[in-house]
Amino acid sequence: MKRLFLCTLLCAISCALAYAIDIPKEHIYIFERSTNSNYVCYDINLQEDGKLNQREPVRGYWVLDEETRLGELTFFERKVAFGIRVVSIKEQEAVVYMTAYKDLKIRVCKHKGKWMGIVKLNGHEMVLQKMFAQMKQSIYPRCEYVDIYGTDIKTGEKRRERIKA
């Protein structure tokens, strides 16, 4: 009976801890896919002195199982799809891109006192909030398009731009 009680107690504690993970609420942006509810968060990576980390200014990680677990990107995911490559970096600004799409440069900087990712699409500069990939399921999943969501820097209006794969 004691063993059953202890097992039940440990299970309850571990379930409670799983829901108590601390996922930062402010991200540079998130990347979602149509395949499931897991998504990749991209957060600013600062050194202890408050300056951008020169080797890895933006850090990506998975948020899994409807926000109950965090997961590291695998080597393959970093190299082929969700990894971040640095184009240029200064003390308080970096230009990066995702390994899956080199043409979309993301300028990471402080804007109105907050760290943000700024992209330029179709002549509009916008604060990046989210990317969403519509996937076609098959033996080898394929991306049909990526929607990029953000806010126009000049007008403040919400924008969505689509990149066909």
Spans of model-derived segments:
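Short amphipathic beta-strand and strand-loop transition segments with alternating hydrophobic
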Residues: I28-R33, I84-V86, A133-Q137
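N-terminal export/targeting and maturation segments
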Residues: A18-E77, K158
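Amphipathic, non-transmembrane alpha-helical stretches in extra-cytosolic proteins
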Residues: N38, F76-I84, I89-E93, Y140, ...
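Generic structural motif
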Residues: L4, R33, D49, T151-I153
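Sec-dependent N-terminal signal peptides
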Residues: M1-A16
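Extracytoplasmic electrostatic interaction patches
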Residues: D103-A165
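Mature extracytoplasmic domains of secretory-pathway proteins
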Residues: E56-E125
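Ser/Thr- (and often Asn-) enriched beta-sheet segments in non-cytosolic proteins
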Residues: H27-I30, D43-N45, V63, S88, ...
